[in-house]
Amino acid sequence: MSKVAEELVEILAKRGESVTFAESCTAGLVAGAFCEVAGASKVFRGSVVSYANEVKRDFLGVSEEVLNGVGAVSRECVEAMAIGAAKAFRAQLAVSVSGVAGPSGGTPAKPVGCVFIAVFYNGQTRVVKCNFSGDRQAVRSQSVQTALQTALLVLNEN
């Protein structure tokens, strides 16, 4: 994990860019994993844990239509979360996560382990839908790994 975070820090520092995170089900674990890297402070602007829909709406700008329609665990929500975080923290790279970590809260359409991750960079957003298995800790751990790996993939493609 730290290897991926180290690469992210290195690339962002070389480019003179910064990163932010907007997290729901991971509750700050992605930012925490990123900041384990020495030198992360050069590129890390800050992050928000937006567990409550009101925070998603009021701080990150996720619309009521999204929250009341497709819901917080959706492609549309994580895309808006990432864009909102990039604006709020004035960061070039923004990563967002929202999902059902369990052990309860799942539905047939969005079972435990259903997690959406978005990476916003250069005006474009990549969203991935994951279906992780395991207990709450396993789902959250896999979410952190996938979020950082997806961010690195996006940076390497740009």
Describe the residue ranges of each PLM region.
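Short alpha-helical segments enriched in small residues
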Residues: 1-158
